[in-house]
């Protein structure tokens, strides 16, 4: 290898969830924002990159299950952890889209992790499990990327942290009208994590419109009113039930997007769903979140509903149905915001800027 290449720092990228998705992303069948900046990290000329793959890691099945339920509980799992540890031996930084890793203390201060919520309160009952979030382990990270300003303040107690707002694939979610019109108006709700579909379903019974819910069966209420259509996404990946081109069409056809959340004030659940709806020019009806830095009502692209308030869902949906022009204005404001604040290009620039700063600081320490 030429010496000028050997002299360049090496960033190892850990993102096992898209190992088999790169081709789909290139073909526009899967959202590009799920790359988390890796496409531009790979193009950067000031460093080299390596993709961490867990497929070559061999662990006996019983041992893997034991480790996944103990030491690696709350982390991406045994094979991913071991693959990342091996890559850290030859890398200057390990860029983890999987969140904090349980073996961070063995990385020689090279691990840079994305965080999606405030540090988990482990309490006194945890010993081996969730060790990725133990204070000593968090302090061993080189830095943190944070989706919210609230989490930036929390993780800054352990390592340098940078708040970078999320983004959305505006080529897939292009905001254009649907090729066809639905037979009747419908609201759309989708998502598997941190959802409160019981409140939404109960509130839907007094709304003169269909409500389509794309969610796992274990979150499905026992009683479903006639105007609610449930699409099961129990299997992973979720787009086995409905692919993204079809989901994009449903976004385009729906009256508004509903995001009923469980009310966890430290979780960013619903963020991606919200941005996809905004990009598609749809009003966002969403449970109040104590974590996200934007909300639909304050910024003028939707309505907020209090946690577990089924009547609030009824009122919000009827509010949208009552005035189509008002609903269109809310949707247009959401699209305007995504074009200005939540593009992939802006997100990737912010990620690369922080990585450059971290590498420069490491170089100064070595010099």
Predicted regions located by residue number:
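Donor nucleotide-sugar binding/catalytic pocket of nucleotide-sugar-dependent glycosyltransferases
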Residues: 140-175, 189
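Membrane-proximal helix-turn-helix segments that form the acceptor-binding/catalytic region
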Residues: 82-90, 119-144
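Conserved catalytic-core segment of nucleotide-activated headgroup transferases in glycan assembly
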Residues: 25-33, 179-247
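Conserved acidic donor-binding segment of nucleotide-sugar-dependent glycosyltransferases
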Residues: 298-310, 319-325
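Nucleotide-sugar-dependent
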Residues: 238-245, 249, 257-275, 286-294
């Amino acid at each position: 290898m030429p010496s000028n290449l050997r002299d360049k720092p090496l960033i190892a990228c850990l993102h096992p969830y898209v190992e088999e998705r790169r081709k789909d992303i290139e073909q526009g069948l899967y959202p590009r924002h799920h790359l988390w900046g890796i496409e531009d990290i790979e193009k950067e000329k000031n460093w080299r990159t390596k993709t961490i793959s867990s497929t070559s890691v061999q662990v006996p099945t019983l041992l893997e299950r034991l480790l996944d339920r103990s030491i690696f509980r709350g982390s991406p799992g045994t094979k991913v952890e071991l693959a990342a540890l091996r890559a850290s031996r030859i890398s200057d930084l390990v860029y983890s889209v999987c969140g904090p890793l349980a073996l961070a203390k063995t990385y020689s201060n090279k691990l840079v992790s994305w965080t999606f919520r405030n540090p988990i309160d482990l309490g006194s009952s945890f010993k081996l499990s969730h060790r990725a979030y133990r204070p000593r382990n968090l302090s061993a990270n080189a830095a943190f990327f944070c989706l919210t300003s609230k989490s930036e303040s929390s993780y800054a107690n352990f390592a340098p942290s940078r708040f970078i707002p999320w983004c959305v694939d505006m080529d897939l979610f292009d905001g254009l009208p649907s090729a066809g019109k639905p037979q009747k108006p419908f609201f759309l709700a989708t998502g598997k994590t941190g959802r409160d579909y019981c409140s939404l379903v109960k509130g839907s019974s007094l709304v003169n419109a269909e409500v389509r819910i794309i969610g796992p069966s274990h979150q499905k209420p026992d009683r479903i009113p006639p105007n609610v259509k449930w699409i099961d996404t129990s299997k992973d990946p979720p787009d086995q039930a409905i692919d993204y081109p079809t989901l994009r069409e449903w976004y385009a056809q729906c009256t508004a997007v509903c995001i009923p959340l469980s009310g966890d004030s430290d979780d960013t659940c619903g963020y991606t769903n919200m941005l996809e709806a905004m990009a598609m020019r749809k009003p966002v009806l969403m449970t109040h979140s104590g974590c996200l830095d934007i909300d639909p009502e304050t910024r003028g692209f939707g309505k907020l509903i209090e946690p577990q308030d089924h009547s609030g869902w009824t009122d919000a949906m009827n509010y949208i149905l009552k005035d189509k022009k008002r609903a269109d204005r809310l949707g247009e404001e959401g699209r305007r915001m995504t074009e200005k604040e939540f593009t992939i290009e802006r997100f990737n620039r912010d990620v690369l800027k922080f990585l450059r700063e971290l590498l420069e600081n490491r170089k100064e320490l070595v010099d």
